[in-house]
A protein has these predicted regions:
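A non-transmembrane, solvent-exposed segment enriched in polar/low-complexity residues
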Residues: 18-172, 181-210
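Surface-exposed loop/edge segments in extracytoplasmic proteins
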Residues: 42-49, 336-338, 457-458
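Thiol/disulfide oxidoreductase modules built on the thioredoxin-like
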Residues: 183, 414-473
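A cross-family structural signal marking well-folded subdomains
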Residues: 241-300
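Structural microenvironment flanking redox-active thiols in thiol-disulfide oxidoreductases
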Residues: 363-402, 411-418, 432-433
Length: 487
């Protein structure tokens, strides 16, 4: 079952207790085990266990007030139905195994009556929508009929929105209504719809208007997680300069001691730590500097806090826009030390970190060789850093005809600390170069950086097949900027 994580550490039987506030009956699930799971973000976690009697009846004890939110009752299969535990309500619900959600009867609980009435309403609207879609396909060659169907389709959306708003107005103090209201996106004012840019910024600034960021219950529903993911990865323009202030403004609206703050900071940090979009690791570094180093991440134990800070600090040196250290390594003779700043004068340098035994490196290297051999212009050099310094390295270079600056660290530098120290004190190289895996955050190969004439990082973690397109776009942008400055 999607997203359900259970830690089944329990013993003994859980009997049906008449005084329990949450009572259920599932016809068709007699004499079996049932689990209660709580949402935290998008995932479900084990919360409690019950056993059904001969009629499929069972119950759960009351939860703590600080654990209110959306839950799921999980039956064998596994199959489950959702419910809301909030506002101190007693709950009485019954259904059957033929359709746990569709056949649900809510006998007691305003919140769950709200939720299941809404589910039934949406199900009916979905059927209407599907019919309209089919009619639209049948009438695609009849403009007038198609336009009429589109209008009906738009009316359906308006009806759903009106229903959602009405529920909120009718039940202002019920979490079930608040959860439905959370799913509504803010509507851009009519006067701004014609101005795309103004409309976008209004929408971004008001994105969380329908969510009470002071209510910790929202992190125990999947809706807040979904809204947060959409905001971070789609709503806000995907550059550090726009993301960082938007994130800080959002978090500033939260109580630092709240579950909402904890969830938002934790997920946002993880999201950009694992992002595949080039340059967004800067957002991860900002999150660690702002919320972890300052002692605000009180939920982190000492070891985990130390690890995330170390990881962030390692990434700082290789953020987009940073000038790299003067990487200076030895060629295949082990005698000539080549500096990317002192000895290479080309406008651009591609740093290519690889391992001759790495399977992916074996595939990418010939592509890089082909790209370089057919590259038009003399403004590019490739500084290829091998993790191996043996004959295997030389064979790899010869086999692939790598007409690059082929460099590595001589074996003796690994074997003798005195030798390594002399290399530094005599100016042959530097500490950052001998520790280049740490300096450039190399935890897997191949790894690519594109540097400009000042050896500033302009691109990183891209594929070999992307280098050419990136350089073309970068040169065009630089040319336009230069022209604009001259004018």
């Amino acid at each position: 079952m999607k997203h359900i994580l259970f830690f089944l550490l329990f013993a003994g039987n859980v009997a049906l207790a008449q005084n329990d506030p949450y009572k259920f009956q599932i016809t068709g699930a007699e004499d079996t085990v049932i689990y209660l799971a709580n949402y935290y973000g998008e995932k479900l976690y084990y919360a409690d266990t019950a056993y059904t009697d001969a009629e499929g009846k069972f119950s759960f004890e009351a939860i703590d007030s600080d654990k209110q939110g959306k839950y799921a009752v999980v039956a064998p299969g596994p199959r489950y139905f959702e419910l809301i535990i909030a506002d101190g309500e007693n709950i009485h619900m019954k259904t059957d195994t033929t359709n746990l959600t569709g056949n649900m009867e809510v006998l007691e609980s305003v919140n769950n009556t709200i939720m299941y009435d809404y589910i039934k309403y949406l199900t009916a609207k979905k059927e209407q929508r599907e019919k309209l879609v089919a009619q639209l396909e049948e009438n695609e060659d009849r403009p007038k009929a198609a336009e009429k169907i589109k209008k009906q389709y738009g009316n359906l959306n308006s009806e759903v929105l009106d229903y959602q708003k009405a529920v909120r107005e009718n039940y202002p103090d019920k979490f079930g209504a608040a959860e439905i209201f959370m799913s509504i996106d803010p509507e851009v004012p009519a006067e701004l719809k014609e101005n795309r840019e103004a409309g976008y910024y209004w929408f971004k600034d008001h994105y969380f208007d329908h969510i009470d960021l002071t209510d910790d219950r929202i992190v125990r529903t999947p809706i807040y997680h979904t809204k947060l993911v959409t905001y971070l990865n789609k709503t806000v323009i995907q550059t550090p300069d726009t993301l960082i202030p938007a994130i800080d403004e959002l978090i500033a609206r939260m109580d630092p001691n709240s579950d909402v703050f904890k969830y938002t900071v934790h997920y946002t940090t993880y999201n950009f730590e694992t992002s595949k979009i080039m340059g967004l690791d800067e957002v991860f570094v900002h999150m660690v500097d702002t919320y972890y180093k300052t002692g605000m991440a009180t939920w982190m134990d000492e070891e985990k806090l130390k690890n995330i800070i170390e990881k962030s600090d390692a990434k700082k040196k290789t953020l987009i826009g940073k000038t790299v250290p003067n990487l200076t390594l030895a060629d295949t003779t082990g005698e000539n030390w080549i500096s990317i700043k002192r000895d290479i004068e080309t406008e651009y340098v591609v740093l290519f970190f690889y391992d001759p035994d790495c399977g992916h490196c074996k595939k990418e290297t010939p592509i890089l060789v082909e790209f370089f051999n057919t590259y038009e212009g003399d403004d590019l050099a490739i500084y290829a850093v091998s993790s191996d310094n043996t004959q295997k390295w030389n064979k790899f270079i010869n086999k692939n005809e790598m007409n690059f600056y082929n460099v590595s660290i001589p074996q003796k530098a690994f074997e003798s600390a005195d030798f390594a120290t002399r290399l530094i004190t005599t100016g042959k190289t530097n500490y950052e170069s001998l520790k280049y895996t740490e300096t450039f955050d190399i935890f897997s190969t191949p790894k690519i950086f594109v540097l400009d004439k000042d050896r500033v990082i302009r691109a990183k973690d891209i594929g070999v097949d992307q280098i050419g397109d990136f350089l073309k776009r970068f040169k065009e942008a630089a040319s336009k900027e230069k022209t604009a400055e001259s004018n």
